[in-house]
Every structure is written in structure tokens, then in C-alpha cells.
Curated annotation (Swiss-Prot):
This is Ribosome-recycling factor. SUPFAM superfamilies: Ribosome recycling factor, RRF. CDD domains: RRF (cd00520). It comes from Enterococcus faecalis (strain ATCC 700802 / V583). Keywords: Cytoplasm, Protein biosynthesis.
Length: 185
């Protein structure tokens, strides 16, 4: 039973790290990244559809995203969805492709985004700590019920703490990498 608690805790901590990676991928760092378009839904034949299912997305230059629709009739819908989104970039449509030129970030905006990165990282750390607390509570309950001995409890608690420390270290590394990316000009 205790092994399952450890496995579940590890899985949940990994999910928190992956979630942070996804969230940080959405933060624009002054260079083109296809994940900027992940949350944009296009109204296509009455159904909301992700941009990446309607078009191929290429990065011909460091600060340019090029969107080539599979169906030329959807180009206006894609352009409209991008304009309505919160990414803050105006699309350029030449009839065949849509280009998004990512503007250079100002120093002030970089610092603002770095704060957002830290906030997201802290949220992930809180999630990891909550997983640790839940796992510890479950282990203590198992010990109380007589499923594991006190020595086993201490051993499993150390394992949970090691998982937590590793996960927090990974979150710090992910955060540092994104901050570095944001602050380089």
C-alpha cells in the first residue's frame, strides 16, 4: 500500500512539473514559439478547433511564426481567432499564409514576465508540497491502522521528502531556464 502512495505522489509531482512547463511555454519570450498558439480556438464550421489542427505552423525566422492553413477557406477564421486572442500580436495575411511577427520585448515587459514565471513556479511548488502532505497523511493513517511499522513509516516519509526535494529542484531548473530565456536580449 505504501509503495502505491509513493508511486501516486511521484506521478502527481511529475504532473505539476509538466503543467509548469506548459504554462511557461505560453509566456512569450521575444522569439517565435508554436506553443503561443496552443490555446487559440478557431470557430471552424461551427466547432471550436485548435489552430494546429487547421494549419501547419512553421518558424522561418527567430521572431516569425508562419501559419499555413490546410484549407485556404479557413484563413480568415484563423486570422480572426488570433486577433481576438490575448497573445497581443497582430497577424499579417497575404491570402495563402498568416505571418505573426513577434515584437522585441522591452526591459519593463521582460521583468513583468519574469515575475509571472516566478508566480507560476511558486504555484507548482505549492502543488508539490500539497502532494507531499497528502502522501504523509496517508502513510500516517496506514501506520495508525497497523499496515506499516513506525520504522517503515520513517523510511517512507524520507522517500516522500526526497521525491519532493527532487521535484522542487526540477521546478527551480525549469524556472531558471525560462527566466534566462526572458532576460537575454
Amino acid at each position: 500500500m505504501s509503495k502505491e502512495v509513493l508511486a501516486t505522489a511521484k506521478e502527481k509531482m511529475t504532473k505539476a512539473e509538466e503543467s509548469l512547463r506548459r504554462e511557461l511555454g505560453q509566456i512569450r519570450a521575444g522569439r517565435a514559439n508554436a506553443s503561443l498558439l496552443d490555446r487559440i480556438q478557431v470557430e471552424y464550421y461551427g466547432a471550436p478547433t485548435p489552430v494546429n489542427q487547421l494549419a501547419s505552423i512553421n518558424i522561418p525566422e527567430a521572431r516569425v511564426l508562419m501559419i499555413t492553413p490546410f484549407d485556404k477557406n479557413s484563413i480568415a477564421d484563423i486570422e480572426k481567432a488570433i486577433q481576438m486572442s490575448d497573445i497581443g500580436i497582430s497577424p499579417t495575411n497575404d491570402g495563402n499564409v498568416i505571418r505573426l511577427v513577434i515584437p522585441q520585448l522591452t526591459e519593463e515587459r521582460r521583468k513583468e514576465l519574469a515575475k509571472d514565471v516566478k508566480k507560476e513556479a511558486e504555484n507548482s511548488k505549492v502543488a508539490v508540497r500539497n502532494v507531499r502532505r497528502d502522501a504523509m497523511d496517508e502513510l500516517k493513517k496506514a501506520q495508525k491502522n497497523g499496515d506499516i511499522t513506525e520504522d517503515e513509516l520513517r523510511s517512507f516519509e524520507k522517500d516522500v521528502q526526497k521525491l519532493t526535494d527532487d521535484s522542487i529542484k526540477n521546478i527551480d531548473a525549469i524556472t531558471a531556464e525560462k527566466e534566462q530565456e526572458l532576460l537575454e536580449v
